[in-house]
């Protein structure tokens, strides 16, 4: 009899699914009620403030891709809330008073910020604090582009979203949150994944682009797009317990291709969905991205041009290292570059980097013949029929502790070759002629393990197609998914 251990292994009562749906609907309705209450309070405060409070009362309603019109002209209010003589109305003075009190920022800094337009690419772990702070600080027009929906496993780090928005568009969720914090700005929703076919059209409407994505081909694409449009690019990254931040293509700083003309090996490109990330780490980097975008927009301070900030969460250490300058030989921003907008739209970034343009899991590999693989259902039948076998789980030990199929033996793939004698002994204990079935999270590492095992003489080794992910989909829907 197969058993699973780990959170979620106990079956819900028959009405559990219905109860969960009702609770989710209640959360959604309560969130909508809170939003309406907030808008009512805002309108009431504007009425109490008199004529000054009416300035921009209906701002922030732009939602379509056409709401931001033309070459950096995305503006939230007539004159961005400033009087003809350049003075601020009472409501803006009160809202941004702590900015205005800063000698290095003051009225001029707020004016420049309110006249700027910034595009945030990605409404995830980096984009969440980034968008919230840009909205709260009063950027004139905030564009948000993302093609994904909110998932429950986003919420530990993507703090702009709420449980009530699970299953809904990330852009809508993020835009609603930004409008709740500041209804006086314009928020433009781009419900797409940014691609070569739409990136130029979207990005050319904004003054500054901020890369808050999590994959290599998109980084190259956004950098190339900003070079073609001559836009500054604030780029951040966070993975595991580390993060980094810099400003590309601004004040003589290099573009991404200047530093990395050749993509790194696929094995070196990790993703949050594979390697994990502590929730606060993208929060730290996202806040710093907002700071850099504000510095670029206002001309206040020294942006991280030609420098890269490195953050180590475990040691609480921040270092800033110098980068080499823009390369005159760069194929995209160099003096003799012939890269055009037409070239950009035809460029295959996934083939160039050998990576998918998605923040989700990497694509499945297929390196074994069909005879060396079995499905989850075939394995379940084998186990239920009591056929002698050994189930080998080759995930890292900390993955095995999250959830596993019992009984199974855990030998991480990285240690498999040195543990072969112990594996051989365990296989003998399982009985003569026992099958060796190999399992991992998604069915990729298990194939690599079977390749190694067959080379070392374990001729009957087979892997389970799709791994534990397929097990949860096809055999046990209550098995914990991570």
From Swiss-Prot:
Chain residues that bind Zn(2+): 255, 258, 330, 333
Enzyme class: transferase
Required cofactor(s): Zn(2+)
Pathway assigned to this chain's UniProt record: tRNA modification; 5-methoxycarbonylmethyl-2-thiouridine-tRNA biosynthesis; Cofactor biosynthesis; molybdopterin biosynthesis
Active site positions: 272, 440
Reaction catalysed by this enzyme: [molybdopterin-synthase sulfur-carrier protein]-C-terminal Gly-Gly + ATP + H(+) = [molybdopterin-synthase sulfur-carrier protein]-C-terminal Gly-Gly-AMP + diphosphate; [molybdopterin-synthase sulfur-carrier protein]-C-terminal Gly-Gly-AMP + S-sulfanyl-L-cysteinyl-[cysteine desulfurase] + AH2 = [molybdopterin-synthase sulfur-carrier protein]-C-terminal-Gly-aminoethanethioate + L-cysteinyl-[cysteine desulfurase] + A + AMP + 2 H(+)
Gene Ontology molecular-function annotations: ATP binding; metal ion binding; molybdopterin-synthase adenylyltransferase activity; molybdopterin-synthase sulfurtransferase activity; nucleotidyltransferase activity; thiosulfate-cyanide sulfurtransferase activity; URM1 activating enzyme activity
Cofactor note: Binds 1 zinc ion per subunit.
Alphabetical UniProt keywords: ATP-binding, Cytoplasm, Metal-binding, Molybdenum cofactor biosynthesis, Multifunctional enzyme, Nucleotide-binding, Transferase, tRNA processing, Zinc
GO cellular component, one term: cytosol
Residues in Rhodanese domain copies: 385-480
Main location: cytoplasm
Subcellular localization, as worded in the UniProt entry: Cytoplasm
Positions contributing to ATP binding: 125, 146, 153-157, 170, 214-215
Any Pfam family hit: Rhodanese
GO biological process terms on file: Mo-molybdopterin cofactor biosynthetic process; tRNA wobble position uridine thiolation
Coiled-coil regions listed in the entry: none
UniProt EC number: 2.7.7.80, 2.8.1.11
NCBIfam families per UniProt: PRK05690.1
The protein's role, per its UniProt record: Plays a central role in 2-thiolation of mcm(5)S(2)U at tRNA wobble positions of cytosolic tRNA(Lys), tRNA(Glu) and tRNA(Gln). Also essential during biosynthesis of the molybdenum cofactor. Acts by mediating the C-terminal thiocarboxylation of sulfur carriers URM1 and MOCS2A. Its N-terminus first activates URM1 and MOCS2A as acyl-adenylates (-COAMP), then the persulfide sulfur on the catalytic cysteine is transferred to URM1 and MOCS2A to form thiocarboxylation (-COSH) of their C-terminus.
PANTHER family found in the cross-reference section: ADENYLYLTRANSFERASE AND SULFURTRANSFERASE MOCS3 (PTHR10953:SF102), UBIQUITIN-ACTIVATING ENZYME E1 (PTHR10953)
Similarity-based family: In the N-terminal section; belongs to the HesA/MoeB/ThiF family. UBA4 subfamily.
Record-given protein name: Adenylyltransferase and sulfurtransferase MOCS3-2
Designated gene of the protein: MOCS3-2
